[in-house]
Amino acid sequence: MDKEKFRQLGEEGFSNVPITREIIADLDTPLSCYIKLARGPYSYLLESAAQGGEKWSRYSIVGLPATKVIKISGQIISIFVAGQIVDSFSHRDPLAYIEEVFEGMNYPNLEEMPIYTGGLVGYFGYDTVRYVENNLKGSVPKDILEVPDIQLMYSNELVIFDNVKGRMHLVTHADPIEQGSFEQAQLRLDRMSVGMAAEVPITLKLPEEGPEIREDDFLSSYGKENFLADVARVKNYILDGDVMQVVLSQRMSAPFESDPLNFYRALRSLNPSPYMYFLDLDDLQIVSSSPEILAKLENSVVTVRPLAGTRRRGLTEVEDIELEQDLLNDEKEVAEHLMLIDLGRNDIAKVCRPGSVVVSETMAVEKYAHVMHIASNVQGQLQQNLKPMDLLRATLPVGTLSGAPKVRAM
């Protein structure tokens, strides 16, 4: 983007304009890029491996440390800038506040730009559903972890890594109204370019081999006796017709003394998946490798993709095919999957145009590094008057983590 185009966007009312620079990156990886440019609090790495884990998807995203962060606990919203709290207030509807923030970011939609140029990045905890479902507000469990329900980083400096072309888009943002902002943005891109030319610092030594972690080393937040008692309760609810499925979950914990990024490195190597991420939120790091989305919104098309029904991967191609057929012929697995298709249709029907919801793919088997799942695709057209946060309200949490009917199961 040249300075004249930048100025014109300012005249059109845009105050948060992405400025990019493309550089060759055929000797780097997304992980090395993260280590060079982004190590530190309030940074992130998003990666994706295609089905089976044999190859990486096209784009990876590296988020440089964010200056501004939103943290929400209950109804209390706190704003942090450069690690210091600058504002804290109560809000009746935290999700509505986030929608207002998102709309106020005022990004132009530019065809020549990469697929993503910044925004809000972070997490919505499972208990965020209590902001949506009034029936669940009176049953808040004890907050053992003492972490916010929601944390979102303002991601204004990032790198879009093109794994196919071996190139990177360096991205920063500037306000055309501010004097000299274009030149300052170019200087920031210069610093990012210089940082990418450096060698990877040897700061991530893998720990020497220590004692093997065993199953008994993990502590449960539930306890076996309580868990089995609740299984019996759930069986009675099912027999009484109250629910069709309940997902009983427990948190397993064990001490971890290495660099959290080493944990992510090991996970991405052992279990490459379509949705992998490392979030460094200062005193909290989140590492994930998952095949599943909650929901996707792109060009007004809503997509949910139920995954249910599982088998391990075969040791040979013949065994792999046999396990796939066994999965598709399993009455219980198929029944559960059909239930989740219906749940997905019901969820997005709340926010999609009447008559637009369709099952665009049914009962396909997706194969990943270690397991295979039955997958279906449910899509619809978002109603014109609704926004992304409305979709989140309608779908949270994903059916595979709640049960059905959702509210009664939770």
Annotate the PLM regions.
Residues 1-410:
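Extended alpha-helical targeting/anchoring segments
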